[in-house]
């Protein structure tokens, strides 16, 4: 991510230190992760100590300090999804992508995470990709859903 884009994001938030989280979220959304150089630039431009920026970036699960895939897959493992076959959906995603929860594939296409609940229990098992919910998933249709994100 280039410095000009980071500066543009900061300027959109009026360069206010109180907008630190919003700035980091915007950079994360644009870049899919927070590179060290971005944290340093945010620290400098917002006049917030780098240690504070790093603290925020490591405290919230929404932020990543390592590259993430263009598409983030979340598999709900809550009780309702679990009893309806979430594990089979997870295993299928792992087989198709070659990654496990917490990993990103080598071509930075997919990152995979499990979550405790996505809040749509009646649709279980649920897979969310880039914020889009796919409900009543079966292992067989998982491949078709993933192909639509290639």
Where are the language model's segments positioned?
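Signature of N-terminal electron-transfer/Fe-S-associated modules in redox systems
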Residues: 1-150
